[in-house]
Design a protein with these regions (language model features):
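Gly/Gly-Pro- and Ser/Thr-rich, intrinsically disordered tail segments characteristic of DNA damage-repair
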Residues: 1-110
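Short coil/turn linker and secondary-structure boundary residues
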Residues: 2, 39-42, 129-134, 145, ...
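Alpha-helical structural motif
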Residues: 3-6, 10, 118, 135, ...
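Glycine-centered flexibility motif
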Residues: 4, 30, 41, 51, ...
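Basic, nucleic-acid-binding surfaces and adjacent catalytic neighborhoods in DNA/RNA-processing proteins
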Residues: 22-36, 53, 142-263
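Phosphate/anion-contacting hairpin/loop surfaces
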Residues: 64-162, 167-174
Length: 263
């Protein structure tokens, strides 16, 4: 499933190609036909990402909400005459660009009231600007008030939006914090540092499209196997303490960490 940096990149791409233009919308597959008519021919005001969800706001007060889930994929092209085969749930196009969406978990048209309900439920998104520090404070409050392990909290989209398995493992390794530590056992400084580091790493992800987390690799193009400290490195030596990287299940998801230096 794409993590938040990828969805932010999709939103940025949508704004670049479609914002301010009249957008035609249809459903080649047919499953989105009735909802497509509600926004077909409207002007796209803005594409906005919050965590793993994207919101396409149109000038008639309606918004198309999209969650890719595990199987969803976007395809952007400038070749409007070369339509690729496949089960396209919804197609967005203007005079110059086309975007095909396949296999999303959620694709629906909702009004502004429904958008607000969803936004209020979602946790703060580290890829969005936070000049007053309000999103950081929301994160601190949600973590510090919970007895759940921090490894579970970071995957809870109501605590923080956009983090998946890779960033969860890498952020906690960089912070030298055990994924089993209860949220309320962490100091405010520790929680704040988690937020700051997450913002830093996901900013790199938005810019490059890669989830690179090793400090010495952040400014380089790096092959996939060398981008991370612990993710999918189970059984190998820890790059910090020479311990052995472990893998276990936490709330049905694979967890990678080093017991030797995360406490």
């Amino acid at each position: 499933m794409p993590e938040g940096h990828s969805v932010q990149r999709f939103a940025n791409d949508f704004n670049k190609k479609f914002k301010g233009s009249v957008v035609r919308v249809d459903s080649p597959q047919g499953r989105f036909s009735s909802e497509a008519k509600l926004i077909d021919g409207r002007i796209l005001l803005k594409a906005k990402a919050i965590g793993k969800q994207m919101f396409l706001k149109f000038d008639n007060g309606l918004t198309c909400r999209i969650h890719l889930g595990i199987y969803g994929k976007w395809r952007f092209t400038e070749d409007l005459d070369k339509l690729m085969p496949g089960q396209v749930r919804v197609r967005f196009f203007n005079e110059q660009f086309l975007a095909d969406l396949r296999g999303p978990t959620i694709c629906e048209v909702i009004d502004q009231r429904a958008v607000k309900v969803i936004e209020n439920r979602l946790g703060p998104d580290p890829t969005n600007t936070d000049p007053r520090g309000l999103q950081k404070q929301r994160f601190i409050e949600r973590v510090s008030s919970s007895a759940s392990p921090i490894g579970i909290l970071l995957m809870n989209q109501e605590v923080i939006s956009g983090i998946g398995n890779v960033y969860r493992a890498e952020i906690l390794f960089r912070a030298q914090i055990s994924p089993h530590a209860p949220g309320k056992s962490l100091s405010v400084q520790q929680i704040e540092e988690i937020w700051i580091d997450t913002v830093k790493l996901m900013k790199v992800g938005v810019a490059t499209g890669f989830m690179t987390t090793r400090e010495e690799r952040l400014k380089k193009r790096t092959k996939k196997a060398d981008r991370n400290y612990v993710y999918q490195r189970q059984g190998e030596r820890c790059l910090r303490c020479e311990g052995i990287v472990q893998i276990e299940l936490m709330a049905t998801r694979k967890l990678y960490w080093c017991p030797g230096c995360q406490f």
